[in-house]
From Swiss-Prot:
The chain crosses the membrane at residues 25-45, 67-87, 93-113. Signal peptide: none annotated. It is a multi-pass membrane protein. The keyword Ribonucleoprotein does not apply. It comes from Methanoregula boonei (strain DSM 21154 / JCM 14090 / 6A8). It comes from the Archaea. PANTHER family: UPF0316 PROTEIN YEBE (PTHR40060:SF1). This is UPF0316 protein Mboo_0791.
């Protein structure tokens, strides 16, 4: 058996190695861990937790009963890890601040992600002056959307109400067309949870399709 006596007396590590060891030791001192590293991890965990909570509620409202439980599973695991870290350090205010700021920022980030996902269908009600809604009806039919037109009476005379069920990610394009071709039209948009049937059957959407299209969409140059 060979015995390694180690470095000879008077041996010194290279300066670069000494510096790396010093930085590593500094990063893992108790004060750095308790007041910076662990609070940052709790902050990030809380952002992820609240984002998942927001998306889970959205998926439940859209009737996605298989995807919502999967998100709930990971959501509760992350929440338990974060809350255990806070409860084990009740005397450290950094943990409370990290948890609170993570909750606030996670709410905002979750709403932004939900908006980018553009999940599900919406119902559009468009009210135009009598005879001026034919262009909107033709446009919706060209986009493979069914329309229901009703003659009604408004405060200033006859109007036409156009009702159509459209994909949520198509709403910006449709509203832009309405504002350009019929700026005087009034329209409202409501979420729809379930669709049974119609003239044009809606296609099943991948919940991440809208988000991917948003990322891939070319941005305008200033």
């Amino acid at each position: 058996m060979q015995f390694n006596p180690g470095p000879p007396a008077g041996f010194h590590a290279p300066p670069a190695k000494q510096k790396a060891c010093t930085v590593t030791f500094f990063l893992f001192t108790p004060d750095i861990l308790n007041y910076i590293v662990l609070p940052v991890l709790i902050f990030l965990a809380q952002i992820a937790n609240v984002c998942m909570e927001t998306l889970r509620i959205v998926f439940l409202s859209k009737g996605m009963k298989y995807l919502a439980p999967v998100i709930a599973f990971f959501e509760i695991i992350i929440w338990l890890l974060a809350i255990v870290g806070v409860l084990n350090n009740l005397s450290n205010i950094a943990y409370f601040l990290a948890y609170a700021f993570g909750f606030a920022l996670g709410t905002y980030v979750g709403l932004v992600i939900e908006e980018k996902l553009s999940i599900g269908m919406v119902i559009m009600r468009i009210i135009t002056t009598d005879g001026s809604g034919d262009g909107i009806t033709e446009y919706l039919q060209q986009e493979n959307y069914g329309t229901t037109c009703l003659d009604a009476k408004g405060a200033r005379g006859g109007v036409k109400m156009i009702i159509s069920l459209v994909n949520r990610d198509d709403v910006p394009r449709i509203t832009r067309h309405i504002e350009e071709t019929n700026p005087g039209a009034f329209f409202s948009i409501e979420d729809v949870r379930y669709v049974n049937q119609g003239v044009f059957r809606p296609k099943k959407q991948n919940p991440f399709t809208g988000f991917i299209h948003t990322l891939a969409r070319p941005r305008k140059r200033v």
